Regions:
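Short beta-strand/loop motif that positions the catalytic acidic residue
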Residues: 295, 301-303, 307
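A domain-start/cap signature at the N-terminus of enzymes
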Residues: 7-183, 262, 270
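Short alpha-helix in the alpha/beta-hydrolase fold that links the catalytic acid
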Residues: 203-205, 311-320
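Catalytic histidine-centered segment of alpha/beta-hydrolase-like enzymes
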Residues: 333-343
Length: 361
């Protein structure tokens, strides 16, 4: 009969083998996906740790060295990311509402670029992202993160908290990006994410357009599906309106991407009572033209002509049903136009916001 110590060593070996499966998958993706320095170090530390565990039944000294080395690498990356992120003084913050406390430490552990690109690469391999959508996306996303790091340093992301299921009305992550102006305008933008959850980089891309009117951009988080029309989603939006109200924001523009845009359309009949609501914008996601029309609010619709998820015909019909008071911008782009056609999307948002602010003033 095997001794308990021997059984434990073989159990650790089995754990190492099981850990090596996702690690090898990530290493394979790393050869075709741009990876950050912290991502590379995490992979290296994980390889050392898994290798040490696998060798446990036979090479105890080697096991100890590998496991210790792996843990040192992983914990060092965690410590450095926590220090850099939680002490960052940029305009991009990830806070928890409604308590308005600082970011969850969990949100600082992994670079968002790695989670986004590894996730997209996996979805592409299993058919969740089409070849046309996949083409050029990694390069566009990598370039966006490079620009964001220059402007903001190391920043947090709500991705991990979202997939663990932490986004609830009593505690949800919000990406808040203050304008660059020393004296911001009393204007705020609420931007709702779509399917796969909230990411700081998308909020930052929208905020760069919003900065033209010196307004604050806030991007709340709900579940990763982006089901804003559920009671929890509506409650999160209401809390976000309240947050901006407490900041003395007088005019609020509400917009969304994909499921976020659909959420705006499905909820607008009950959100129309928010006194600060001044306009709506939809990016690759439209719904409920009649209810939107009844608000009498100005509307911006941005749509990709080659969108495989939201047919361009649906956007055109939505615009036709709205009639007057709508600005329609159609781009030669697929569903991921915010990342692939960033400048065109930002210019459309900036021009529309400037026009609305000029009219209101």
């Amino acid at each position: 009969m095997l001794k308990s110590s021997t059984l434990l060593r073989y159990l650790l070996c089995l754990i190492g083998i099981l850990l090596s499966i996702p690690i090898l998958a990530l290493v394979t993706l790393a050869f075709i996906t741009p990876v950050t320095v912290s991502g590379i170090l995490y992979l290296f530390g994980s390889i050392l740790l898994a290798s040490g565990l696998i060798l446990t039944p036979w090479q105890l000294k080697t096991r100890n060295a590998l496991v210790l080395g792996g843990l040192i690498v992983i914990l060092s990356v965690i410590g450095l990311r926590l220090y850099l992120t939680l002490n960052e003084t940029s305009n991009l913050k990830v806070i928890v509402l409604p308590s308005t406390r600082g970011t969850r430490s969990l949100n600082a552990l992994i670079d968002e670029q790695d989670t986004l690109l590894f996730g997209e690469g996996l979805l592409h391999l299993i058919g969740g992202v089409s070849p046309h959508e996949h083409e050029g996306l990694a390069l566009a996303v990598t370039a966006a993160y490079q620009e964001a790091r220059v402007a903001n340093g190391v920043f947090s992301s709500p991705v991990l908290s979202t997939y663990i299921g932490f986004q609830k009305p009593d505690a949800f992550d919000v990406v808040v990006i203050e304008p660059s102006a020393e004296r911001p305008s009393p204007v705020g933008i609420i931007f709702l994410h779509g399917f796969t959850g909230n990411v700081s980089i998308q909020c930052w891309q929208i905020a760069r357009a919003v900065d033209r009117i010196d307004a604050v951009t806030v991007c709340p988080s709900t579940n990763w599906i982006g089901e804003w029309w559920l009671p929890e989603g509506e409650a999160i939006i209401r809390e976000t309106f309240g947050y901006l109200r407490e900041k003395s924001i007088q005019r609020i523009y509400l917009g969304g991407f994909s499921n976020g845009g659909g959420g705006v359309g499905r909820l607008i009949s009950i959100l129309a009572d928010e006194p600060e609501l001044s306009g709506l914008f939809f990016i690759a996601g439209v719904r409920n033209a009649q209810a939107v029309h009844e608000t009498g609010l100005p509307v911006l619709v941005i749509q990709g002509a080659n969108d495989e998820r939201i047919p361009v015909e649906a956007a055109r019909q939505f615009v036709a049903d709205l009639g007057e008071g709508v600005t329609y911008v159609e781009l030669e782009a697929d569903h991921f136009l915010i990342m692939k056609q960033t400048q065109a999307v930002q210019e459309a948002i900036s021009a529309w916001l400037l026009e609305q602010e000029k009219t209101l003033k």
